[in-house]
């Protein structure tokens, strides 16, 4: 992922500590864009999977991505991508009762000191900071140690009733992680993430990592991308669309009018969002 100032983190720092949480909540009071959200929800849902099968999101459906502030369950979107730790089982059930699909957001490539399981990741596994306070890249070569830690997180997603997972920080090899990571290391780790999700009946999305799409499009069930329009990269996501797999896309610095025509042509599920990833959205 690109680093500030050219690009923000894959999500706004999840400021959920004490007073900061209250300030963030106040900052997110502007509701979602209602001009684009008056349509009925379930008509763009992918068909329900048969028992024992995973949900497969199809291209072009509507979605909402909210990681901060009080969860707004009234947004008229077919898919909700929300924080796996802070979202409750009851909130997931409410969304699913209303016909929505739910994606469990987690960081799988970086350590976060504010997560309840932070102490389970040994210090030697934590590398350089990834540009955000309290976060460090993980040594993704240590598959045997990481597997049970990530498996426990995915168990949490499954037990809360999520349909899918969005694993973040999936391109450590392209960053100054503090470890001599290779593209092969990243492929091995990303495929471990896929296996752990699929073993639990969860769909899984490839987050950014554009260079490895040709190798990974067959493994992942959908893609999540930030700012491909700003950096003229959206065409690189078309293998997912060609495979009948959704691409959930967000822009922060471009108005929707700048990227929506191309997004519709490419069948991307695109949003304009603010960097805090609160409830506000403008859908294409």
Language-model features, listed with the residues they occupy:
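Bacterial signal peptide processing site
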Residues: 29-32
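C-terminal motif of bacterial Sec signal peptides marking the signal peptidase cleavage site
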Residues: 24-27
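N-terminal export and membrane-targeting signals
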Residues: 1-20
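Compositionally biased, intrinsically disordered low-complexity segments enriched
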Residues: 5-8, 34-38
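Glycan-processing catalytic domains of CAZymes
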Residues: 18, 37-284
């Amino acid at each position: 992922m690109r680093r500030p100032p050219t690009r923000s983190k894959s999500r706004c720092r999840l400021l959920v500590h004490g007073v900061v949480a209250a300030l963030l909540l106040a900052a997110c009071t502007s509701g979602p864009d209602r001009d684009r959200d008056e349509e009925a929800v379930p008509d763009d849902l992918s068909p329900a999977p048969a028992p024992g099968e995973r949900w497969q999101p199809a291209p072009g459906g509507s979605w909402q991505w909210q990681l901060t502030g009080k969860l707004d369950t009234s947004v008229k979107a077919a898919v909700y991508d929300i924080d796996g730790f802070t979202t409750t089982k009851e909130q997931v059930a409410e969304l699913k009762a209303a016909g929505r699909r739910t994606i469990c957001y987690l960081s799988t490539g970086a350590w976060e000191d504010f997560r309840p399981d932070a102490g389970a990741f040994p210090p030697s596994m934590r590398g350089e900071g990834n540009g955000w306070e309290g976060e460090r890249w993980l040594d993704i070569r240590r598959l045997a140690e990481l597997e049970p830690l990530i498996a426990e997180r995915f168990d949490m997603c499954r037990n809360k009733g999520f349909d899918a997972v969005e694993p973040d920080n999936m391109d450590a090899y392209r960053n100054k992680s503090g470890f001599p990571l290779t593209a092969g290391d990243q492929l091995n780790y990303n495929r471990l993430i896929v296996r752990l999700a699929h073993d639990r009946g969860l769909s899984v999305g490839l987050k950014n990592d554009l260079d490895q799409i040709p190798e990974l499009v067959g493994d992942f069930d959908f893609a999540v991308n930030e700012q491909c329009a700003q950096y003229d990269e959206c065409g690189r996501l078309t293998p997912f669309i060609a495979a009948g797999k959704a691409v959930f896309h967000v822009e922060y610095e471009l108005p929707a009018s700048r990227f929506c025509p191309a997004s519709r042509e490419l069948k991307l599920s695109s949003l304009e969002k603010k960097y805090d990833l609160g409830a506000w959205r403008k859908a294409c």
